[in-house]
Amino acid sequence: MIYLNKYRHITEEAEKSLYSLVKDLINKNTTNILEVGTMAGQVTVILAGAAAEKNESVNVISIDQNYDTFSPTAAESLQANNLFNCSFESDKLEERFEENIIKANIIYIDRFHDKIGSKMELIKKNAIVPTKVIYRNPKASSNFPFEVTEVSPQVKPRQRKKSTENTKAATKVSAK
């Protein structure tokens, strides 16, 4: 993988690990991978590469806020890798994240480290298909930096209509 930005926030070993993990998680029902990142593009390239290799129809939706205007963007790194299965959204990260949860089968959270608990609750509330959530745990990044959780939508059984019993005596009708 060609990654144009010099800033790397995960090691090469973690890159390989994430690449294989995502490839293993993608199945025939996977349509979108949602990534909330940091605009450097390292993880975006990994996710898009794994998705393209496993199933060309899987798209990556990357929600990022660009704080670094001097370094190459994720889009430039994707282009260098001939990966075009990615769309970008920026601005209003919280809103964009919530709006896109329903589109994703796999969610990678590389931002919101302090808010993982509240983000998981949001995902549980909004997921409409079984969703695998991968997030970085910076405190444990020396070993295996990723945690994976599966969230299944809460399907409530439909309430049956109460039948109203007719207690009146039925009137016989004869056919002539």
Where are these regions (language model features)?
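S-adenosyl-L-methionine
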Residues: M1-L4, R8-H9
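Positively charged N-terminal leader segments that act as targeting/secretion signals
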Residues: A169-S174
